[in-house]
């Protein structure tokens, strides 16, 4: 049973959001979490469920390809709409496979070796050979990832937002990579930001944000925030 507590934001009646943090190639954990969400929905049906993945599907873990291909295949939960957001690791992977030399180096040192290997590629082979191992359908999925999604009083992004900057003009770089100036901000953003990117031992609930990266790939948990009405709970695998 999910233990709910007061949330800093609110969703309209009949709406429930399941938001999953950074996956990083931990495919088995993701399958288990999807199954747990399905069980919760069967026990507690709701009119308007939504599944959100906040990005960083690839790198570090053993099965980036499996994660991407599962999500690219369509809604993992039947009849539950799904929003897939981009993380900084997807952005780096895309740029690396498009031939950006600096991004290729960054990708390899931030977990890209494991990711490329999961697609059958050789990280030590010429960089010009890498792209051929990643199917076009997977690249199309990655390129089409959204940067943000808002429901009720919640804004879902990968990393966070720049305090003092209007939501409509936030830069891609900040949405994908921001840390301290967002994490330690005492500003009311006008929405509660649900984000990943910065791993913590447990989910973080602040008045202006909820952090759900709990370091699954670093022997932590894969976390799903369950948002409903004025409450929040968590499912972990």
Indicate residue ranges for each PLM-predicted region.
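Short glycine- and acidic-rich boundary segments immediately preceding or forming the N-terminal edge
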Residues: 1-32
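A short acidic-Thr-Gly-centered motif at the start of a beta-strand
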Residues: 3-13, 42-44, 72-76, 147-150, ...
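A general structural motif
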Residues: 14, 46-48, 79-81, 152, ...
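Short hydrophobic beta-strand that contains or immediately precedes a catalytic carboxylate
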Residues: 19-21, 53, 84, 156-157, ...
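Active-site environment of divalent metal-dependent phosphoester hydrolases
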Residues: 25-28, 59-62, 89-94, 163-164, ...
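Core catalytic region of metal-dependent phosphoesterases/phosphodiesterases
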Residues: 26-105
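Short amphipathic alpha-helical segments
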Residues: 31-32, 65-66, 97-98, 168-169, ...
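Acidic, His/Gly-enriched loop-helix segments that form or flank divalent-metal centers
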Residues: 106-211, 215-221, 227-237
């Amino acid at each position: 049973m999910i233990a709910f507590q007061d949330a800093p934001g609110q969703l309209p009646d009949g709406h429930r959001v399941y938001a999953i943090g950074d996956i990083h190639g931990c495919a088995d954990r993701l399958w288990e979490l999807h199954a747990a969400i399905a069980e919760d929905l069967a026990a507690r049906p709701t009119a308007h469920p939504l599944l959100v993945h906040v990005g960083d599907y690839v790198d570090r873990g053993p099965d980036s390809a499996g994660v991407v291909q599962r999500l690219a295949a369509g809604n993992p939960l039947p009849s539950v709409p799904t929003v897939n957001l981009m993380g900084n690791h997807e952005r780096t992977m895309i740029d690396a496979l498009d031939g950006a030399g600096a991004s290729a180096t960054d990708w390899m040192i931030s977990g890209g070796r494991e990711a490329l290997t999961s697609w059958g590629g050789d990280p030590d082979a010429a960089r010009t050979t890498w792209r051929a191992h990643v199917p076009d359908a997977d690249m199309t999925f990655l390129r089409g990832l959204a940067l943000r999604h808002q429901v009720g009083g919640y804004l879902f992004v990968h990393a966070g937002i720049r305090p003092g900057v209007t939501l409509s003009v936030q830069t891609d770089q900040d949405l994908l990579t921001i840390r301290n100036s967002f994490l330690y901000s005492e500003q009311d953003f006008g929405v509660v930001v649900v984000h990943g990117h910065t791993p913590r031992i447990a989910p973080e609930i602040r008045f202006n944000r909820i952090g759900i990266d709990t370091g699954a790939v670093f022997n932590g948990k894969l976390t799903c925030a369950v948002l409903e009405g004025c409450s929040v709970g968590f499912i972990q695998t």
